[in-house]
Amino acid sequence: MGTSYPKLNIAAFGMEKIVPDLDALGVFTRLLARSATGQPVTTYTSHYRRPREGGEYHIIIVDNGRSALLSKPDHIKTLNCIRCGACMNTCPVYRRSGGYSYTYFIPGPIGINLGMAHAPEKYYDNLSACSLCMSCSDVCPVKVDLAEQIYKWRQDLDGLGKANTGKKIMSGGMKFLMERPALFNAALWAAP
């Protein structure tokens, strides 16, 4: 209602919000409502085609690092996200922490990926707030492979100089034990 009265309207949104036609808009509107809140259709959607008579309508398409993400083939699917929140609703870490496990302003699995795409040196610690259970990838309505992307970001930590030495040593030790079944069984037997 607040946009129907003024003679000047300014809309700002990310480039991933652009849909090719009204048929696609219908699909995304239903998909967003079902995935976010379980409703058959959303209760509030605004559609703007042109300015009102004698008015102006300006559209600002915000890039905010999105085009840089296009150059990362392993993470390009992040741009498919419709921000429904289904990944957060199913994430065991998010459900238990309420989002406080994350330092990026968007929590959950999608926030981990967006934070790493935006500033990996600042948000790399969010990668440990994921159990890689893959529930987020299974529930995503637009098939963003969130867990796979988080796994790939973890592999990139060495290149960023942010890999956790303690975790690397522990993983190396586990790899060593797992490759030697007799030694692994002996370790299990000796454990308290």
Regions found by a protein language model. Give the residues of each.
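Ferredoxin-type iron-sulfur electron-transfer modules in oxidoreductases and energy-metabolism complexes
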Residues: 44, 52-78, 93-192
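Short Cys/His-rich zinc-binding micro-motifs
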Residues: 81
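Iron-sulfur-associated redox domains of electron-transfer enzymes in respiratory
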Residues: 1-71
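Extended amphipathic alpha-helical segments enriched in small hydrophobics
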Residues: 84-88, 133
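Structural signal for hydrophobic packing residues in well-ordered secondary-structure cores
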Residues: 26-36, 88-91, 95, 154-157, ...
